[in-house]
Amino acid sequence: MTTRLNETDVPEWLRQRLLAAGGSVPFRTYMGWALHDPEHGAYGSGRLQIGRRGDFVTSPSLGPDFAALLAPQLAGWLAELAVEMGLDLEEAAGPKQAAKAGPRPLALVETGPGEGELALQLAQALAQGWPELAACCELVLVEPNGGMAARQRQRLQASPLPCRWLRAEALAQSPCTGVVLAHEVLDALAVERIRWDGRHWRQQRVTFSQEAGKPESLELIDGDSLGPQTEPVLESLGLWPPDPRRGPGWATELHPELAPWLASCAAGISRGRLLVIDYALSAERYYAPQRLDGTLIAYRQQEASGDPLRQPGSWDLTAHLCSDSLVLAARQGGWRLLGQRSQGEALLALGLAQRLHGLQTPVAGERLDLATALARRESLLRLVDPAGLGAFHWFAFTRDSSPTAPSGQGRPPSSLPPGPAPYPGSQPSGEFPLPLFLRDP
């Protein structure tokens, strides 16, 4: 059964792919092509533009405040790791160590770094606020798309930290110790679209129609029914056994690429933390009967569309994360959840309210630039707007294999973030201090 029709002509590259595949492919395959194909994909080709004048806005594209608020959390985690390693930061940051070739002992790893704006802002914040820590740290950019990597290299020429670009497979060959940041990355992993036909869950596929007298157009059609091996997954999400409130035609997404992504991420980190920042809903809300067509949406030039088949390769395709699926996949991949919060709550805990208040009081000897202050105020409020970026969720994970540092080894930097000293050596193995963004503001 056809569930959606797109009236746009089918690009020749996609038409040939579909013909070579027998006429149709799972939606998951189509989404991967539309986003990550090196020549035709929105990300793979580098066609997509991020920012106020681009296709969509992200938190770092609103200005440096997001990175400035996030930096203390990342610095705290990096300092904890330094203590776990028994690393003396003063010695490690000294001239003898600086002269050594090769990777630095700590890494800030960003996956899917977009334009490179957040990586640059974080590197600058670390170098300014925690110079000893920054001297022991490098930026590792995990970017599979050549078009985006080229733009990141240009942007990060100004980075105060050394930068390396690696694919996930290469990082797994030489794992590092550090913090992994996945900001608006997992929502671009290809999802599986499924549809209830009244008796079975069916995988949705993408094909093209060839009606006489009409241009070719893309369609979503029902494919094979899901086998019994998928019932445990469906049951864990509340999709099995069938609920009569979900009538024929009810459709949604599954996230099969989360588990391999998280496992790959774990393979590249011998010891560390992981911070995922993305749109997310609990399974109860994601798969609520009243959500008739999932969360899949397309973005281009600040316009949102509910049609994922529109001009393939020219639109960003994104779907919310299911927080239950994310936490389960992380656990299976060797990560342990430290906690989660909405972005609004996280940024308030990290000092956003104080930053807003500070806009009213100019630095001694400086005049208050009202226009600049109002623009920054608007950007800060957008970061916590519950109808927008404030609805993002932050998920903090740690590797279960991370050992406690031997007592007395390692020295954290003198300019640690506020709060208890990170990861004191007296803590029992396996226990971690509460991340800063999970503390009450």
Regions inferred by a protein language model and the residue ranges of each:
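Rossmann-like AdoMet
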Residues: M1-T111, E115-T177, E345, Q354, ...
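Generic recognition of stable, solvent-exposed alpha-helical segments in well-folded globular domains
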Residues: D9, V25-T29, S61, D65, ...
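A residue-level signal for conserved active-site and pocket-lining positions in enzyme catalytic cores
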Residues: A34, V180, L326
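Short helix/loop capping segments that flank catalytic or ligand/cofactor-binding pockets
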Residues: Y43, A188-V191, E284-R285, A405-P406
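Short, glycine/acidic-enriched loop or turn micro-motifs at the edges of active sites
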Residues: G146, L186, L281
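Conserved acidic residues
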Residues: T177-G178, G272
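A mobile, often basic/glycine-rich helix-loop segment
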Residues: V179-G238, P289-Y299, P435
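Long, Lys/Arg- and hydrophobic-enriched amphipathic alpha-helices
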Residues: L234-P441
